Amino acid sequence: MAISAWMPLLVALIVVWISAAEVDAQVPGPRTRYQPNWASLDQRPLPQWYDDAKVGIFLHYGVYSVPSFGSEWFWTNWKNLRNPEYVQFMQRNYKPDFTYQEFASQFTAELFNATKWALLFKDSGARYVVLTSKHHDGFTLWPSKNSYGWNSMDVGPKRDIVKELAAAIRKESDLRFGLYYSLFEWFNPLWTDDKLHLLMQQHFVERKVRPEQMELVQQYLPEIIWSDGDWEAPAKYWRSEEFIAWLYNDSPVRDTVVTNDRWGFGTACMHGDFYNCADRFNPGVLQAHKWENAFTLDRTSWGQRFDVSLSDFMTSKEVIKEIITTVSCNGNVLINVGPTKFGTILPIFEERLRDMGRWLKFNGEGIYGSVPWIYQNDTINGNVWYTRQKEASNGKITIYAFVLEYPYDTNELDIYPLGKDINIFRNVMLTGIDMGTGGDILNEQSTEVVMLGMEDTKIKWNADHNRLHIVFPPKNHIDKRGLDYAWTFKITIT
């Protein structure tokens, strides 16, 4: 039936519930100071921009882009693990005494155009970008003072890739710029010596890691610090709590910066503004703490490679599904592409990003700034996922139902946005909809159904209590609008 007279109280209860679940973020207070320990750092509210953004682009770019074989772990797979495929690849294609360092001079990036990249990411519908400033091979994409002769200014491109991309992103778009930074380096002698001393000394952290972390933040002002390569040492060795406390308290990005959860073994899914937990993490159920699903369009490698076939790439439909299922459960997506050594992005990656941008242009209303609904996945139809508008304003609640599979057989769909088996307490307390009076809850007087992208087309629908029966517009009309991959119904209840 209609919204209860005690709607204001119930709306307040919705806000309390969401806040308790850490779904809605807040801007941290400018004078709050955090101590260098997890108990204090974990109290920091998540900056609102990150929760609203939902979609980011990840870039794995570096010397490993030169051999373009296997994955970005090329060096250690070849020299450390002695993987036969990598060993044979080198034997077939390079002289016997060839070293990984020699790839750096071939990392030319002569076609790298930061403006072109920025415009593509803007068109993709992403709201933030994260670039690998340094991967596990230790090569930096900026002229690090602590990586002499092993950075993009001294060898290879002879350019500050980080600086150029940061400037272009900020000039050409409203996207936020972030940096990935690997803590450990496979073959750095300072790191290997610290390990030989059972991590009882921290020479690598003191002389390499901490100076570079500070340099990156102070010079390039990244609003995402995406830490990695942490798992071989505890956070105390990396002095992670000290660094994060400085980020939150005194850094030039203290009010807006966000960090992930890779700060030493045991920190994953435990500490950080958002949790990655693992690569390609997508639990499919609501998570209380903000999280991020980092996945790569090439299913196997994060770096660009040529030993790849079409089936190794995610389809545009799969990308859209990953966005929907992640955002419905309180996550963001970080979608990775690997540029070529020349500085170009392969057409297949560009196609996926532009397809995503077109889809978000029509359906982004249900993605950006949304929060989870009381149900993430439809009770009966597993191909339907839900989000809702953040605020229940003007006595209205707006739900978005994302349909992943088109009902070709009937052109009709039954969904249960309020749940099939009504739990009066749960639904009334979380929605403000009084379900205890019987009769139709969803009706023409209290409910409006619109298909995003076809707002000018009246949608035929009817309801039986909590079941909503929707008739799609003719498929050829939908196709003419360029609506593909997944279809969104906006359900407004007053």
Swiss-Prot record:
One annotated GO molecular function: fucose binding
InterPro entries xref list: FUC_metazoa-typ (IPR016286), Fucosidase_C (IPR031919), Glyco_hydro_29 (IPR000933), Glyco_hydro_b (IPR013780), Glycoside_hydrolase_SF (IPR017853)
The keyword Hydrolase is annotated on this UniProt entry: yes
Protein's GO biological process: binding of sperm to zona pellucida; defense response to bacterium; fucose metabolic process; glycoside catabolic process
Residues modified by glycosylation: 113, 377
Catalytic activity: an alpha-L-fucoside + H2O = L-fucose + an alcohol
Record keywords: Glycoprotein, Glycosidase, Hydrolase, Signal
Assigned protein family: Belongs to the glycosyl hydrolase 29 family.
Name listed for the protein in its UniProt record: Putative alpha-L-fucosidase
Source species: Drosophila melanogaster
